[in-house]
Amino acid sequence: MANIVNFTDKQFENRLNDNLEELIQGKKAVESPTAFLLGGQPGSGKTSLRSAIFEETQGNVIVIDNDTFKQQHPNFDELVKLYEKDVVKHVTPYSNRMTEAIISRLSDQGYNLVIEGTGRTTDVPIQTATMLQAKGYETKMYVMAVPKINSYLGTIERYETMYADDPMTARATPKQAHDIVVKNLPTNLETLHKTGLFSDIRLYNREGVKLYSSLETPSISPKETLEKELNRKVSGKEIQPTLERIEQKMVLNKHQETPEFKAIQQKLESLQPPTPPIPKTPKLPGI
């Protein structure tokens, strides 16, 4: 039996051409293109960065998201049956190759690009920015600045949503993977700032408010602003709606036995106002 993780060059090229045709629909190549590299820990809500970029480019930008190519593996359904939740690591080499090929082809033609990432390391953004600048691109980096408790809850909610859709392939983000990005992102961003490769590094919160721009304050590193936001204390009232949504999804998914569910329930109970004592009924005379 052939290894179903493998795929032929012809299969790959056919899918690549289909993707390119679909992605360039309604988009125009420009004389001075810009590439926007995105960063932020898992669960931070990086897709919300697209709104600011669409506004900046009047919608003339192509989003390249590695995750969207994973299910395009020619043998994806068979791989799901075989590996279930571990399918992601078996299709990632395919999605990585697809992402690289799409970036290469579209940047040859001069389209504005949005390239998803996390900022877990500095190598990939540096390599990508260097390669694109050699093709005449201006490179910018936009990063989510979200308190770590909010993004961690975001990873749980995303998993529960995926589980409701397809329990077999839903894959939780380990807390350790989330925390590694939280720990490394501020220093990595400072390193990227010092390279001078990016004409602007911006920080945004989930509401789309710009918290920092290296273009506006070039002498100030983004590190301090990001660290402050990552470690910002969030009130119980702020996260209560999120906790309630997650609790509801976990009940529907029958995940009440998980440590996460118990921790969320405990937190919600602590946010409830204390029950006032029942007033004693005064005794009536003669009774």
From Swiss-Prot:
Chain sites annotated for binding ATP: 40-47
Catalytic activity annotation: UDP-N-acetyl-alpha-D-glucosamine + ATP = UDP-N-acetyl-alpha-D-glucosamine 3'-phosphate + ADP + H(+)
MF terms in GO: ATP binding; kinase activity
Active-site residue list: 67
Keywords for the protein's UniProt record, in alphabetical order: ATP-binding, Kinase, Nucleotide-binding, Plasmid, Toxin-antitoxin system, Transferase
Region ranges (Disordered): 267-287
Family: Belongs to the zeta toxin family.
Annotated protein name in UniProt: Toxin zeta
Organism annotation: Streptococcus pyogenes
Source lineage: Bacteria, Bacillati, Bacillota, Bacilli, Lactobacillales
